[in-house]
Design a protein with these regions (language model features):
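Glycine-rich, flexible N-terminal cofactor/catalytic loop recognition
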Residues: 1-56
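Generic beta-sheet signal
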Residues: 1-5, 71-79, 127
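Residues at secondary-structure transition points
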Residues: 14, 56-63, 88, 124
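Short, glycine/charged-enriched secondary-structure capping and boundary segments
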Residues: 18-21, 43-46, 65-67, 89-94, ...
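Phosphate- and divalent-cation-binding pockets in alpha/beta enzyme and binding domains
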Residues: 39-40, 85, 114-116
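Conserved helicase motor
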Residues: 52-59, 132-137
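Glycine/small-residue-rich loop that forms an oxyanion/phosphate-binding "nest" at active or ligand-binding sites
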Residues: 62-111
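Class I SAM-dependent methyltransferase SAM-binding "motif I" and its flanking Rossmann-like core
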Residues: 92-140
């Protein structure tokens, strides 16, 4: 089973109890930056093998994850902050999971855009999220 796990977006204490339980229970963790994820895992005394899954190796990492899942391993996918797939790697992997009829689930976590909406004071019963602003090196 693949677990898509939400991680804190600033404060390491903002991780859910369920996310910590899953990270403790899986065989391996796929992450954007192993150094960054190691900091989170160390804060909760979690010792698991890590391997990179980022925008530069997502296709190869997805193939590796598929192989491990077919071997019966449980894998967690995390991003540096927030939810994988939301402006982070994971879309290729989920498409491959569906194509290979492999199970996955989402462990919710912190949400940057919901926090921003609430902090804005513009809260209403309707809102739309159309993505994050491009980074300073991107073309608009």
């Amino acid at each position: 089973m693949l677990y898509i796990v939400g991680t804190p977006i600033g404060n390491l204490k903002d991780i859910t109890y369920r996310a910590v339980e899953v990270l403790r229970s899986v065989d391996e963790i796929a992450c954007e930056d192993t150094r960054h994820t190691l900091g989170l895992l160390n804060a909760y005394d979690i010792k698991k093998p890590l391997f990179a899954c980022h925008k530069f190796n997502e296709r190869a990492a997805s193939e590796k994850i598929i192989e491990k899942l077919k071997e019966g391993k449980n894998i967690a996918l995390v991003s540096d902050a927030g939810m994988p797939l939301i402006s982070d790697p994971g879309c290729i992997l989920v498409k491959e999971l569906i194509a290979n009829n492999l199970e996955y689930t989402v462990i919710p976590g912190a949400s940057a855009f919901v926090c921003a909406l609430i902090m804005s004071g513009l809260l209403d019963y309707r809102f739309s999220f159309v993505g994050f602003l491009p980074d300073k090196n991107s073309e608009c």
